[in-house]
Amino acid sequence: MLIPLREVIAAYNIKLNGVLHVGAHQCEENDAYLAEGVKQDDIFWVEANSKIAKTLTLPNVITAAVSDVVETVTFNVTNNGQSSSILPLKDHRIVHPDVHVVSTESMVTQTLEDIIRERGIRANFLNLDIQGAELKALKGLGPYIDQFDCVYTEVNTRELYAGCALLPQLDDWLRWRGFWRMRTTMFEKCGWGDAVYIRGNDEYCLMSSGRTGNHLFQLAACELLKKATGRPFVVHFVEPWKLGSVLTYTPREGTKSAFQINDEYFEDWSIFKGKEETIKELFAFRTPLVGINECIVHLRLGDLADQTSKLGTAYPLSVVKHLPKGVPVHIMSETPGHPYVHLCLDVIRRAGYAVDVLPAQSFERDFLRLVQAKYVLGSSSTLIFWVGLLGALNLPGKQTSVFLSSNMPMSFRQKTMYTNDPPWFCRLVDIDRGQ
């Protein structure tokens, strides 16, 4: 184990009542389990290599190749023993050229569901070390996934074995079943390591990063997770919630007793695609929306991250090409006195538009006005994403234009929210292409 068991137990306050260790090898971890108070009879070992399994003298050794289904497979035995797998070697041959297959054995796999049920195994700690087949083993747990509090598993970030699951796939599968990756130790050059997944309790506390647009992403993602899994957990939120007077949704205030999610940005449009009606119901407005026949050019300088010198007049000149005719035009900015706001104002006026800068208002009022404005033009921010989505879901004729450029920061945001799978409720404008 690359991560010492004692550190896992201490960090996450786990009390072991039993262990299921899949990929026993020489049972090297036995002393560590005993040191944590687990009785020898409550430790179960599964080993696919029959020659190794025969040499093990501990109780509860089960000779079996584990997978997600019962099927005949070829078990590849390597010269070092530890790299043997039901999957063929792939990049492993590059990373560890000294390791090679010396023999093969035809085997019928078993599922962990069958193994646990037939032997009456009671364990809350699962250790997987089966060379790329870890996700297959997890999928074969069936309902017994619910008896585990911790999953310690080998993980891969490159395809060391043909068809092996990579780390993001394990994250996704376990997260949807209430487990969160809390610690990872990797041999980066080799593409493999170990990870610890801990079951969360029924109260999740979002330690949010970002601003309100990203908060909406995080809260919506958690609520969709709650709906999809049927788990009755409560979402707490430690940030000040700025939309309480506008939206009916109000998350509970954060609490230290809740399981804390310290995650990256939820900024992937694909997780909401096809679930728009659920989003509309979740983030319902307190008062009926009324469309306003106006155009708002949104300039939040924080989204441009001081790249205004690189953007120069290219941004406002692109905006001018997409302004509607015969509609009042306003610039909205949290920093109305910023020189770049005045540069944009001047460019738009020179193009013949009567445009003004709106006075600064509360965030709630600005958000509501952006949603209700018929036309909104803005940068690739999370705020504009939600303005466009919620506006389109509630008001017919809502038009949101999102301006993209390599000179804008957070290129990953432009991809996950916009260009990878363009949202139906936004028109994308590529400044770099002269659009």
Model regions and ranges:
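Short internal beta-strands
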Residues: 45-47, 148-156, 234-238, 329-335, ...
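Phosphate/nucleotide-binding beta-alpha loop and adjacent structural elements of enzyme active sites
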Residues: 1-202
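Donor-binding and catalytic core of enzymes assembling or modifying cell-surface/extracellular glycoconjugates
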Residues: 212, 327-419
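Secretory-pathway luminal glycosyltransferase catalytic domains
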Residues: 205, 233-327, 336-338, 420, ...
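A short, glycine/small-residue-rich beta-strand->loop->alpha-helix junction that serves as a flexible
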Residues: 208-217, 306-309
